[in-house]
């Protein structure tokens, strides 16, 4: 099938997948995995695992000193394990319900649309539990808006971060972004300058103990480049407001498990996390002082953010 840049989307109702295809892009959503299973842009696959909500960043020396991990440690478990409890599909604004087999048999032949939307609702394993809703909205141009909504719940401890984690198949060659210079956090960005910056080394900051690092605040867009039979680039843009992100070769859990840098595995993936909320890192001292109240993230309040995969 030949598509034009502004032509209709081809929608495929699989038994256990929902596909949206167009000129130079393919998106596949897995009902079994509970998320976006594949992003292919110009023949390059960008996903190794389904993106999921993320609640945890690796601890810092200041976190350990203040005992933050003892108060909020359940968010690390929530970051690793969650239940996808609901999936809904809408095409051109018409609710299609959950069209897995055998309900998908009602769609015969090629199906085309101008917009497709699929929503996933995740339940956390925290006590008490709460929910996160993620909406993927694909436009006919191939741009995909991602809307993320965390539902606050009374009784939950403070969050380290809240965002979405994308695990990519190989280590990125570099990334370019427009935002604040250097490593920045909500309470550590006063000296940063706005600009466009190129980062061609995804290594961790060489602290004595591997820990949280390389956050980039107030970002308007980021382009990640990787090699697969040539250079390929994936662009993520802010939607309503700027976002924070990190782009590292390790998950927070891998960093957490290492007490020395030589204990980290060889880099083999890109872990790209985009955040709607980030806790400060403190630094008043490392033996008990908490982050200032203004830089806490309440888990009892709703958090919403959105971005665009261009």
Where are these regions (language model features)?
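Beta-strand/loop-rich accessory regions of lumenal/periplasmic or secreted enzymes
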Residues: 2-310
